[in-house]
């Protein structure tokens, strides 16, 4: 397999891996995860009665992966263009198709935006106030189709993919960080270099959208990197990351946390997503973002075949086909 296609497929598969690994403990505190599974490894079904994913089977993904593949297909079908109107239309179509607006499946910003879009609102107005991580969780495909040498173009594309649900500087900043890391990894950058590219993109992204009171995503990402490099064991690292950076659905916590587990796991998708699943908090989304970045570094071959078989069969996704299509429109 071509190296660039391998990275693109690895990115999409890593995203699904982190999502499915984190699904059972989504929005649980670390203590509850430990009491239920000990150290969580591999795929598990959702615990009976889980407030969000009750009934999900082992290896099943959530809205993180579903929205990312929706965005990927939208970009593919537009020959690499990223247009807010297209993404808004397909976001509503996806939500209707899977019944996403029922129950607690959607994040708060996306749920509000989708209802407004259904009523016919302008997609450039429906993302007002959206500061959670729904833009960052689905953004990896933009990193697959935009090159790191033109961060303004990457930031433009991220903004177009985000504005209908998350039109705030902080949300776009977080999404730019993820897309920037993925984009640089696709070009063969090393881990520190790709993170610097992501941080540079995040700084640009913060200037877009509504300006709200929020901590700096790049600054908190640097804190997460510092914690990841400490000489502690993994349990202690995760506790420090949870306590000092956070693991909630806000962009300012979850995106830096994803960077932290990415660095701690050395860019290995299996190790990175396992760390994310054991962190607590928004484990599926942190795992999806971290897994996408790690997969773009390590490629599809870093994910065991048996693991990939579960992801593709349970969720009816094809990371290789989609990755190949996106590489074909990369610019």
Where are these regions (language model features)?
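Structured, active/binding-site neighborhoods that engage oxygen-rich ligands
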Residues: 1-331
């Amino acid at each position: 397999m071509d190296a660039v296609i391998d990275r693109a497929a690895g990115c999409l598969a890593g995203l699904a891996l982190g999502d499915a690994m984190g699904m059972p403990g989504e929005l649980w505190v670390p203590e509850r995860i430990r009491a239920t599974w000990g150290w969580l490894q591999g795929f598990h079904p959702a615990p009976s009665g889980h407030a969000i994913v009750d009934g999900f089977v082992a290896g099943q993904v959530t809205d993180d992966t579903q929205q990312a593949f929706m965005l990927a297909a939208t970009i593919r079908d537009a020959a690499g263009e990223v247009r807010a109107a297209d993404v808004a239309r397909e976001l509503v179509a996806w939500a209707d198709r899977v019944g996403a607006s029922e129950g607690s499946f959607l994040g708060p910003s996306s749920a509000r935006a989708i209802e407004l879009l259904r009523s016919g609102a302008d997609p450039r107005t429906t993302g007002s106030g959206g500061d959670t991580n729904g833009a960052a969780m689905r953004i990896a495909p933009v990193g697959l189709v935009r090159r790191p040498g033109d961060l303004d173009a990457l930031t433009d594309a991220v903004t177009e993919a985000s504005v209908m649900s998350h039109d705030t500087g902080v949300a776009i900043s977080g999404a730019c960080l993820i897309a920037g890391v993925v984009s640089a990894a696709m070009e063969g950058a090393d881990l520190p270099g790709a993170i610097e590219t992501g941080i540079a993109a995040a700084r640009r992204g913060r200037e877009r959208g509504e300006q709200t009171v929020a901590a700096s995503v790049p600054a908190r990402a640097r804190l997460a990197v510092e914690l990841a490099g400490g000489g502690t064991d993994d349990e202690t690292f995760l506790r420090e990351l949870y306590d000092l950076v956070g693991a909630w659905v806000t962009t300012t916590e979850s995106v830096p946390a994803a960077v932290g587990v990415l660095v701690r796991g050395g860019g290995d998708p299996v190790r990175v997503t396992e760390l994310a699943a054991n962190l607590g908090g928004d484990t599926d989304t942190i795992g999806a973002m971290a897994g996408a970045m790690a997969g773009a570094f390590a490629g599809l071959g870093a994910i065991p075949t048996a693991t990939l078989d579960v992801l593709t069969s349970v969720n009816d996704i094809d990371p290789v086909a989609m990755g190949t299509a996106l590489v074909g429109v990369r610019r």
